[in-house]
Amino acid sequence: MIKKIGVLTSGGDAPGMNAAIRGVVRTALGAGLEVFGIYDGYQGLYEDRIKQLDRSSVSDVINRGGTFLGSARFPQFREVEVREKAIENLKKHGIEALVVIGGDGSYMGAKKLTEMGFPCIGLPGTIDNDIAGTDYTIGYLTALNTVIEAIDRLRDTSSSHQRISIVEIMGRHCGDLTLTSAIAGGCEYIITPETGLNMEQLISNIKDGIAKGKKHAIIALTELMMDANKLAKEIESATGRETRATVLGHIQRGGKPTAFDRVLASRMGNYAVHLLMEGHGGRCVGIQKEQLVHHDIIDAIENMKRPVRTDLYKVAEELF
């Protein structure tokens, strides 16, 4: 059985990452394993920023946002020589397996290490909720609450000024965060990678709302789809109603994780250690229908696709 494991966080931070690290560390120590923290993601792995952790290392972190191990984007990890150096550093410390917490880019790094014979377990840590093989990612529901709070505030001022507001929400190529934020925040319109934008229909809907006496409208837009400020100008020109864009940006990644994310992250961290002790490597952890599951990490990246939430889009359409 393995005796030493490492844990790192990579890519964009997400609330609950610290809880996941804590879950890994406390479970491993309780099972008699040694645990090493790799600081600043794959870059720290390459540069040998590796330190042994104990119980006190993860005291009072469960309620903190971000990741105390730090994170960094490190595109050089695509290079074989860089990964070979990383594995050399792991072996120098006697580390036999690695838990990687992050998004799809982090999973790709874990996949590459797995293909080179070093066992890794991936935990889905991203607010985008865009990882295949899991219903929820660590940090997604905390970010949802953050976005809803912002939408509530925008609604107050938009109503006061009879204004149309566009709120740009993170998610990259996945509209889950935008979709659920729009439903929970009572937005009038939604634009995601899954729905696209029918400008003619959008303008028609806004004009219909104005004719019915609506004082404001909130439009939820997934980032990277289009320039939010340009869209605001086009809507204002077409409707005659003042329109402003608000880009929430990185505020969505911060803040204390919700109870759900703390429990989810703790469960996933615990589960990852048990998988490694049972001899499983090259896996990624998810939660599906409230049950923890694990999938082949290569298959998850190359073949598995996240299902489009057609049920929620139907709800959104009927409510808007």
Curated annotation (Swiss-Prot):
Transmembrane segments: none annotated. Keywords: Allosteric enzyme, ATP-binding, Cytoplasm, Glycolysis, Kinase, Magnesium, Metal-binding, Nucleotide-binding, Transferase. GO terms for biological process: canonical glycolysis; fructose 1,6-bisphosphate metabolic process; fructose 6-phosphate metabolic process. Substrate binds at residues 126-128, 163, 170-172, 223, 244, 250-253. It is an enzyme of class 2 (transferase). Pathway: Carbohydrate degradation; glycolysis; D-glyceraldehyde 3-phosphate and glycerone phosphate from D-glucose: step 3/4. The active site is at residue 128. SUPFAM superfamilies: Phosphofructokinase (SSF53784). Its main location: cytoplasm. Its cofactor is Mg(2+). Belongs to the phosphofructokinase type A (PFKA) family. ATP-dependent PFK group I subfamily. Prokaryotic clade 'B1' sub-subfamily. NCBIfam families: PFKA_ATP, PRK03202.1. This is ATP-dependent 6-phosphofructokinase. It comes from Vibrio cholerae serotype O1 (strain ATCC 39315 / El Tor Inaba N16961). The lineage of its organism: Bacteria, Pseudomonadati, Pseudomonadota, Gammaproteobacteria, Vibrionales.
